[in-house]
């Protein structure tokens, strides 16, 4: 077999792939792992111990793989000089063992049946599945697993992993693509919170450059942008900047008046919500997004989602982003003045936008002047806004579940809360 140099006493990482193709690869055969037949697996990251006092050193090893009696795969590095010396490569499928995790989704008694439903629609074999059956996949999953609002994080990620393994077959029809995008985004939201989410996000973002297949379908565009909004919490800055650049290109070509709209523009609301959800991009870019939103809001017929987006972009506390990407207080104050000039009874979302922009954090670099926040408190009280909104501006504190749901755009998985970033 092939030999490798293994570094002991230092963190090492092994990238694994599996093949879903029909080629019978032989053990030890060198293969170019390219194309849709290869699927990236979770990497093995570990430190293989050296003998006491030996420090870091290289040893020549060969890889062995065996299937255990219970059907799991074990991999060892075996010393070429002394076969009795071997190191088990542990698959880090549960994250840090010191971090308590909910019970595995495999314990859900109906999960195998749910995975079979996903396989029927997106499986490798060519099955006669009509459009109605594809559309009904989510309903069938809910009949098996209960209402989707109750699906916990391990179950959601098990479903996402099954969908991701079959991502290459999402393009069979417009219905396939739309259904896959909807379910993949829902089961990965908010893009963080579970072991291996970083790896899942990395795999998912590999699809971004491909775009959608059925570009004449406005509903497919809507699901496409919603997918990335739902996953945005786990997307790194570089990925978010790439998404924002593509979004800007589409939004800049938005037609005025009665000019013909492209199908992508049918998903305008979803594009706006996604742009506001990209909290990892530098503040300079978020300022540009906010300015563009304010310009759009000068139009009498502008959608209400744009007010939600302005509040999210100007928020003093990001849902998952870093504090250094928050829009500077002096700029946010200017936005808030524009919001205060409105009739909140006529434009209900403006009140929540104001509460987010004026929220007290206790950080002088982020907080707006007291007089401006007092004005917001009075306006919120006069418009009979929820007490929780008034408290955010007057006293600060954490978002309640309902307000976090409103900020995120939908409910988070059961048991998961986004903690405010200091």
Task: State each model region's role.
Residues 75, 135-143, 176-190, 218-234, ...:
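Amphipathic alpha-helical elements of HEAT/ARM-like alpha-solenoid repeat scaffolds that form extended
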Residues 25, 87, 151, 180, ...:
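A residue-identity detector for tryptophan
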Residues 134, 138, 152-225, 236-269, ...:
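Long, leucine/valine-rich, helix-dominated scaffolding and oligomerization segments
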Residues 1-48, 234-240, 253-301, 305, ...:
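Acidic, glycine/GT-rich loop-and beta-edge segments that sit at the periphery of enzyme/chaperone cores
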Residues 1-195, 293-296, 418-422:
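Acidic low-complexity intrinsically disordered segments
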Residues 121-128, 143-151, 162-173, 187-190, ...:
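Surface-exposed polar/charged interaction patches
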Residues 117, 121, 136-140, 144, ...:
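Charge-rich, solvent-exposed alpha-helical interaction surfaces
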């Amino acid at each position: 077999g092939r030999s490798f140099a293994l570094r002991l006493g230092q963190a090492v990482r092994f990238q694994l792939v599996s093949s879903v193709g029909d080629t019978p690869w032989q053990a030890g055969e060198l293969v170019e792992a390219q194309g849709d037949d290869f699927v990236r697996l979770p990497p093995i990251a570990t430190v293989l111990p050296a003998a006491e006092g030996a420090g870091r050193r290289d040893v020549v090893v060969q890889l062995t793989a065996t299937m255990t009696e219970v059907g799991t795969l074990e991999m060892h590095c075996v010393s070429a000089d002394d076969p009795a010396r071997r190191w088990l490569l542990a698959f880090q499928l549960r994250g840090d063992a010191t971090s308590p995790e909910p019970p595995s989704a495999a314990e859900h008694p109906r999960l195998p049946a749910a995975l079979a439903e996903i396989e029927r629609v997106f499986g490798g074999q060519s099955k006669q599945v009509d459009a109605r059956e594809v559309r009904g996949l989510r309903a069938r999953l809910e009949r098996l697993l209960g209402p989707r609002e109750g699906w916990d994080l391990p179950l959601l990620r098990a479903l996402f992993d099954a969908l991701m393994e079959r991502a290459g077959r999402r393009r069979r029809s417009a219905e396939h693509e739309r259904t896959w995008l909807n379910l993949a985004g829902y089961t990965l939201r908010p893009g963080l919170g579970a072991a291996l989410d970083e790896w899942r996000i990395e795999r998912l973002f590999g699809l971004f450059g491909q775009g959608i297949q059925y570009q004449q379908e406005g509903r497919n565009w809507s699901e496409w942008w919603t997918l990335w909004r739902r996953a945005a919490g786990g997307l790194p800055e570089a990925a978010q900047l790439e998404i924002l650049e593509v979004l800007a290109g589409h939004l800049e070509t938005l037609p005025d008046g009665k000019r013909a709209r492209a199908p992508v523009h049918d998903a305008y609301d979803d594009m706006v919500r996604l742009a506001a959800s990209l909290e990892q991009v530098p503040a300079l870019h978020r300022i540009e997004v906010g300015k563009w939103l304010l310009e759009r809001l000068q139009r009498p017929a502008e959608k209400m989602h744009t007010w939600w987006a302005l509040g999210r972009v100007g928020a003093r506390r990001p849902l998952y982003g870093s504090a250094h990407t928050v829009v500077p207080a002096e700029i946010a104050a200017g936005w808030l003045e524009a919001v205060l000039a409105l009739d909140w009874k006529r434009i209900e979302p403006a009140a929540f936008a104001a509460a987010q922009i004026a929220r007290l954090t206790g950080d002088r670099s982020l907080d707006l002047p007291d007089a401006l926040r007092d004005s917001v408190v009075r306006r919120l009280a006069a418009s009979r806004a929820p007490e929780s909104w008034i408290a955010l501006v007057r006293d600060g504190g954490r978002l309640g579940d309902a307000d976090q749901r409103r900020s995120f755009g939908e409910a988070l998985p059961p048991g998961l809360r986004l903690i405010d970033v200091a």
